[in-house]
Amino acid sequence: MTRKTNDAIEVRNAVKRYGTFTALKQVSLTISDNEFFTLLGPSGCGKTTLLRMIAGFEDVTEGGIFLFGEEIEGLPPHKRPINTVFQNYALFPHMTVLDNVGFGLEMLGKSKSEARKRAGEVLEMVQLSQFSARKPSQLSGGQQQRVALARALAPRPKVLLLDEPLSALDLKLRKAMQIELKHLQKETGITFIFVTHDQEEALTMSDRVAVMSAGEVQQLGDAREIYERPRNMFVADFIGETNLLEVTVDQIDAGRAACHLGGGHRLTCDAVDGIGAGARVHMSLRPERLFLSSAPTESESLKARVRENIFIGTDISTILDLDDGPEFRVRASNSSRGTSRVFDPGTEVFVNMERGAARLLVD
């Protein structure tokens, strides 16, 4: 089946079973041409299985996978215009960097001179031209990763799959490579599909993110939407840090939901479709959207007591106990210019929130 489309990849009702275990359950999504798309989720959620199905390393039990409208199920990996960068870069230790990058091109029938010319072009693109004569063992981890990227980009694939390629790098290099990968994707115009369990990687690089759990896509959207408007409790808890409070919805009026939690505390937030008056649900409150004061600043300020302050570099995380209520966390910038003050343990304070900070969740 073929149909004209601008979608680089379409996954249509894809199911993957291993015996009696279902690894993917009716997954459907589309990935646009020239998009940086990330599959994000914990270990065992099905993200790598889906990536391997797109690459052709795993068969689809049910459903289909389409590349620019053409079904590719049954097409072997080497006949798909798709390349993969794995966690293990799998560079040939006896070959130079230039030969490693050009090897795949020669296997595709390019002459040695053509392969070397193209290899030189992509090495320049990833800023490794000066290392072309070196062996992989003479390179750092970050340089080896860029060689693997260059090798995957050399044949000009329509789609590049990246299976947690940054996981072996140290934090500082990983952050630098996140920016470099994003720039490289825009420069080449190739669709990137990136797999990771790291929320920061996903939010930093991606045009859109599919958050996965238990073989299903829990939410699909851009970074801001995923973070600020999580669809359910799993997404809110998995993406970043949040306070999850069990609340009862008392009433809904003019698009606002009035809720109460333990200890007589009351909070108001935007109403959410599917959650009506009387519902017992969870509310998400991001710590960085809360601030502390010595006196209430609004009618719904929550009285609490500081238990502990944790210094984490640029921020300070404060753990609080609400009066007759749950534990709370507030995150403040480690700067005198920040909105939230930092109080000593044992101090009675009030927790205040920015408008829009609270989000009701469909459990």
Show where each model-derived region lies:
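ABC ATPase nucleotide-binding domains
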Residues: 36, 75-237
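Non-catalytic connector elements of ABC transporters
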Residues: 242, 252-363
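Pre-Walker A (P-loop) beta-loop-beta motif of ABC nucleotide-binding domains
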Residues: 27-38, 92
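The feature captures the beta-strand-to-loop junction immediately N-terminal to the Walker
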Residues: 40-42
